[in-house]
């Protein structure tokens, strides 16, 4: 997908690992118009494995040498930190053309995952997530909402998830968009009670979509409990 009004994405470029691990690594970075800090990733890994931030050229050779695989991805670093210095990762689900908020993870680490964030220990962060889940448009703003609509239309999928941050300009910073995004329900801890309505809304939308498609195919209705 090409960026358009309302959203931006990180510029990625594949490169042989031995180039970055050798004496010409910094020259390759400059030639391809990347600047430090930048991200370096081994393709095929998930949940942040083998995905690192390189602050300057001094750390490039060693970092590239220690990552697995013959090919790496050099990725532009787009700063998703807010005025408080914390990074934010929003997740929405796109079900049958509608956009649903799923969660907001806030962390002091640039590499934000809900399971490794400090949401459990920060009531103020949970309040911020609650505000996002309760009124997505007010939290994100019109530019980011327009960006989400553009991404939805470009994907053209019945089911998709999008992870993103917000730029100071109000534009959406796209991290990831795919058709296999997981809807992970929180545990029974009462601290997460505010998240359950949003998750239920997404699951209900998925069930309704499946039933609609099944009815169109002349299939029997699908039991909600089996989903």
Q: PLM features: what roles do these ranges have?
A:
Residues 52-147:
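Phosphate-binding site of ATP-dependent enzymes
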Residues 38, 73, 100-101, 160, ...:
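Protein kinase-like catalytic core scaffold
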Residues 45, 97, 167-170:
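Short strand-connecting beta-turns/loops that link adjacent beta-strands
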Residues 162-164:
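Hydrophobic residue at the +6 position relative to the catalytic HRD Asp in the kinase catalytic loop
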Residues 138, 153-157, 166-227:
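C-terminal active-site "lid" helix and adjoining low-complexity regulatory extension at the edge
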Residues 1-51:
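A conserved helix-loop-beta module that forms one wall/lid of the active-site cleft
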Residues 143-158:
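Short, internal acidic amphipathic alpha-helical interface segments
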Residues 11, 70-75, 158, 205-209:
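Short, structured loop/turn "capping" segments at alpha-beta junctions
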């Amino acid at each position: 997908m090409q960026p358009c009004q309302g959203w931006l994405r990180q510029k990625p470029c594949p490169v042989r690992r031995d180039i970055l691990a050798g004496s010409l690594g910094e020259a390759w970075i400059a030639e391809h118009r990347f600047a430090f800090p930048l991200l370096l990733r081994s393709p095929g890994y998930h949940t942040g494995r083998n995905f690192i931030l390189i602050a300057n050229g001094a750390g490039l050779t060693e970092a590239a040498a220690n990552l697995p695989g013959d090919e790496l991805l050099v990725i532009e670093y787009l700063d998703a930190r807010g005025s408080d210095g914390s990074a934010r990762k929003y997740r929405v689900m796109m079900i049958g053309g509608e956009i649903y908020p799923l969660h907001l993870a806030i962390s002091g680490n640039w590499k934000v995952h809900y399971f490794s964030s400090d949401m459990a220990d920060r009531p103020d962060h949970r309040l911020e997530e609650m505000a996002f889940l309760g009124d997505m448009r007010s939290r994100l703003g019109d530019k980011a909402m327009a960006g989400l609509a553009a991404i939805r239309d470009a994907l053209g999928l019945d089911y998709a998830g999008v992870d993103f941050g917000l730029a100071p300009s109000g534009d959406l910073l796209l991290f990831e968009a795919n058709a296999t995004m997981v809807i992970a329900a929180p545990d029974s801890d009462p601290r997460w009670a505010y998240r359950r309505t949003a998750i239920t809304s997404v699951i209900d939308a998925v069930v309704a979509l499946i039933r609609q498609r099944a009815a169109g195919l002349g299939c029997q209705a699908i039991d909600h409990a089996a989903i």
